[in-house]
Amino acid sequence: MPKEHKKRGRRDEQKKRKRDADDDATAKRHKKDDVDAQFQPLDAAHQLHHGGVGEDGELTRPGEVQFYGMLDEDEQEFFKNVDDQLDRNEFASPDERAQWLKNVFKEAEGKELKIANSQSCSRVLERLILLSTPGQLKNIFEKFNGHFLNLVQHRFASHCCEALFLQAAPVVTQELANPERLQTPPSSNPDHIFVSMENLFLFTLAELQEHLGFLMTDRFASHVLRVLLVVLSGSPLERQSKSVLQSKRKEKVDVTGAEKGREWLAEKRAVPQSFLEALEKVINNCVSGMEPHYLRSLATHPLGNPTLQLLLKLELSHFGKSRAKDEKSLIHRLLPDDPIAEGTDSAAFINGLVYDPIGSRLLETIIENAPGKLFKAIYGEFFKERMGSLSRNEIAGYVAGKILERLGKDDLEEAMRQIVDQIPSLVERNRTAIIKTLIERCVARGVDTASIKAQLETAYGGSNGFEVIRILKLSEEDGKPGGEHKQQSPEKLHGSLLAQTMMSVEGPLGNLVFDSLANLSPELSVQLARDPPASRTLQAALTSPNASVIFRRKMIQQFYGKVGELALDPSASRVIDAIWNGTAGLAFIRERIAEELAENEGSLRESYVGRAVWRNWRMDLYKRKRNDWVKQSRYTAGNDGFQSFPESDGDASNSQTRAGKHMTAIELARQKHAAAKAAAQGKKDMKKEKTERHGTGSNSSAVGTKGRVVAQ
């Protein structure tokens, strides 16, 4: 296994600063004893890589990493001050910051490589890249040109390369959409040659091309290579799995002012045809020189596996699933047998991945992206009769989840029958992710969930029937006031997600959770609100379209007298925010909550989360102009008059449409009673008016006169 990826920068005070040359040497080592013991074929795989074998048959690795020198003390102090100024963000205007940034880059002129390799200053360069203009990004590209092979393998410089590729990606799309951007701008340097961002990326790829096989399993370069592949493909950068693009331990580097205009991260980008051609060439070169045996060894390599996943996904999504028939394709090299049957190399490969902590992730990618014909063959041969046993396993359960996402209705019903029998065992082992996926797919395919409901009701049953606190794993220590919010266990998070998924299903399955929540004591309800995972379940319950008015009324009333206290808690404050939407059709409850918030104004204003609740509930308007607050809150609820209990003063049907999908029997009875009472009152008023209009005796003239006056 590779060494632990420590956080970098001056914040890691426990480590002494080392020379960059030592870091470079460390970056090239992979705990050779551990890795080679498990993945012996890798060196041979690298030797077989195109361009990776010399004439004498020895492995051609990248040369010695170049040492670019170190910043002197004054330079380090300067960039430390730059980092502090970025944190303070005390610029009067964006123009002032742009001018300051220009001066910083002027000071850094000629020192870019030293900064990128510096333990204390590389983070500063990474933050500066996030604020850079396209011209400044191109300048950094040009300074790094010819040195990328060294930089991507460096512990600190590799982060700068990642940031540079990500920030430069939209510039390629902008230049493609607006060719006038490619016109050579006036330059003070007559020898300056204008280069498009497209060509800068292609130059970088050409520099790395010869050593791609080695970089795929390099501790730091593998992450940069994946980012570069995603940029070339035009795929959304934020939708990629974090484990595929970067290490889980990677420090999140950000800077104020870089948040705006980053919507492109979640969007598919238009890229030039040269990028797609380069991507196809990379995929071909990465596998063309490797025998299938050596290529498969990457599937269980901790660094090679994510790169292999990405290459496989990009191949099938960008070049058509018909590519699987091409003998030179990556998917065909991994699974060459047709048909795939027991006893073949492909079968041995698949069976070896199912229970492997690393290899199973590649199998998930194959299942998710394989052509329909190939998926059906794999499912029928290896998994159709094993869904129950797969779901019980901690690792294979995730493979089973991916399989469920691709099954049709008939196959899903058969798989459900196998998994439902295992639900008691799954609940006992806290492996609820597969149950959540099964419910979601049953809803999507229109499969009846009655058997799932029965098993869950039994598995989480107690003295009072189904107990939601068992599914949420709530202990006596959780949610206590003044307690610290510790990192939550995966079991609690998965339990909360399962409860939320159940509530998204209309009918008996969702009602299990709703009824259990409504029957909790006020103390337990407050405890749930304070517990982070359980709090999200409460939020979902209060805002669910399947939650009835009666449930929301009962649930919210559990918090009476505790609203001010809960609004100060980081988790419970979000429940108070959710009550705003949860009181649609419940005017008196919304105003009751607002009154409690107003009573605790002082403490709320002194707390960060309290101020957020105060703002979300528009309490400033409530304090100044309460009538306006009432009108606006009624308008946002979509009902001119909120539904009160037990009678309705407004449009009950509209309230019910927004608050819940269906009215219960008692709600229908109340609506009918209110309508009958209103009709009776109307008849009574009409009779009285008729009597007054046709008055008798000495009062007839007076009554008639009064009627005429009113009519006027």
Curated annotation (Swiss-Prot):
Bias (Basic and acidic residues) ranges: 10-35, 682-695
Polar residues composition bias: residue spans: 640-658
SMART domains, sorted: Pumilio
GO molecular function terms listed in the Swiss-Prot or TrEMBL record: RNA binding
Protein localization: Nucleus, Nucleolus
GO biological process, one term: endonucleolytic cleavage to generate mature 5'-end of SSU-rRNA from (SSU-rRNA, 5.8S rRNA, LSU-rRNA)
Keyword Nucleus assigned: yes
Family the entry assigns: Belongs to the NOP9 family.
Record protein name field: Nucleolar protein 9
Gene, per the UniProt record: NOP9
